[in-house]
C-alpha cells in the first residue's frame, strides 16, 4: 500500500473509529464537519485518493458508501502509533498509551520511526520542534551526545538534547527560557525511550 498523506491518514482513522463506535462509516458531510472542511466535496476528493491507494472501496449511490479494504480491517495495518499520556512505570509503547494510528511509512525517516509523540510545550522551538507537532521517534535505549532524545526522568517523559559527562546527564532545551534538566545517575532514574528522527508539522494535521 502506498504511504498516505497526513490528512488522508487522519480521514482513514476517522472512518475506522466511526465504524468501531457506530457500526457504520461516516457520511461525507460528517467527515467534512469533523475535520473542518468547507464542503462535503472536499471530503469526497480525499476519499477518492484513499480508494486509489487501496485503503477503502467507494460504493456508489449511498451517503455511507465506504468500505474498508481487507488490509485495513486489521489493527496491525494501522501504521505508526501516536503515543499520548504515559503512565508512571509502564512501557511507552504499552497499548493503553496509544491514542490512534497514522498510516505513515516508517521508512520516510532515517533510522525508521517506531512511534509518534505529540509535542507539548516550546522547549525545543529553536530547532523547529513546536507545540502540537508530531515527533517521529526511533525506539532506542542508548544515545550519543548531541542527539535529540525522548527520555524518561523518574516518571516524566521529555524531549531534549542529550549530553552525558561521567555519571551526570544533561538534557538541554533548545529555548533560552529553559534550563537544562540535570540527572545524577548515581541517585536518580533516567532511561532513553527513543531518538527523534523527524517532525510532522502541526498544520499538516489540522
Curated annotation (Swiss-Prot):
Catalytic activity: Hydrolysis of Ala-|-Gly bond in repressor LexA
CDD domains documented for this protein: S24_LexA-like (cd06529)
EC numbers for this chain: 3.4.21.88
Site (Cleavage): 88-89
GO molecular function, one term: serine-type endopeptidase activity
Keywords: Autocatalytic cleavage, DNA damage, DNA repair, DNA replication, DNA-binding, Hydrolase, Repressor, SOS response, Transcription, Transcription regulation
Superkingdom assignment: Bacteria
Uppermost EC category: hydrolase
Annotated catalytic residues: 123 (for autocatalytic cleavage activity), 160 (for autocatalytic cleavage activity)
GO biological process assignments: DNA repair; DNA replication; negative regulation of DNA-templated transcription; proteolysis; SOS response
InterPro entries on file: LexA, LexA-like, LexA/Signal_pep-like_sf, LexA_DNA-bd_dom, LexA_repressor, Peptidase_S24_LexA, Peptidase_S24_S26A/B/C, WH-like_DNA-bd_sf
DNA-binding span(s): 28-48
Protein's job: Represses a number of genes involved in the response to DNA damage (SOS response), including recA and lexA. In the presence of single-stranded DNA, RecA interacts with LexA causing an autocatalytic cleavage which disrupts the DNA-binding part of LexA, leading to derepression of the SOS regulon and eventually DNA repair.
HAMAP family membership: LexA
Assembly notes: Homodimer.
Family (UniProt): Belongs to the peptidase S24 family.
Name of this chain's protein: LexA repressor
Designated gene of the protein: lexA
Amino acid at each position: 500500500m502506498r504511504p498516505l498523506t497526513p490528512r488522508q491518514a487522519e480521514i482513514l482513522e476517522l472512518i475506522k473509529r466511526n465504524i468501531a463506535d457506530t457500526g457504520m462509516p461516516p457520511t461525507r458531510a460528517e467527515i467534512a464537519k469533523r475535520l473542518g472542511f468547507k464542503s462535503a466535496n472536499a471530503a469526497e476528493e480525499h476519499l477518492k485518493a484513499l480508494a486509489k491507494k487501496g485503503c477503502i472501496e467507494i460504493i456508489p449511490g449511498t451517503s455511507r458508501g465506504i468500505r474498508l479494504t481487507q488490509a485495513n480491517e486489521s489493527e496491525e495495518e494501522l501504521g505508526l502509533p501516536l503515543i499520548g499520556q504515559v503512565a508512571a512505570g509502564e512501557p511507552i509503547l504499552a497499548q493503553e498509551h496509544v491514542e490512534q494510528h497514522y498510516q505513515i511509512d516508517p521508512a520516510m525517516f532515517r533510522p525508521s520511526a517506531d512511534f509518534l509523540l505529540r509535542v507539548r510545550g516550546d522547549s525545543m522551538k529553536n530547532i523547529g520542534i513546536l507545540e502540537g507537532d508530531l515527533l517521529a521517534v526511533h525506539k532506542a535505549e542508548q544515545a550519543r551526545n548531541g542527539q535529540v532524545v525522548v527520555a524518561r526522568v523518574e516518571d516524566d517523559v521529555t524531549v531534549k538534547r542529550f549530553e552525558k559527562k561521567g555519571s551526570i546527564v544533561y538534557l538541554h532545551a533548545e529555548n533560552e527560557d529553559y534550563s537544562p534538566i540535570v540527572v545524577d545517575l548515581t541517585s536518580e532514574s533516567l532511561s532513553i525511550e527513543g531518538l527523534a528522527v523527524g517532525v510532522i508539522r502541526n498544520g499538516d494535521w489540522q
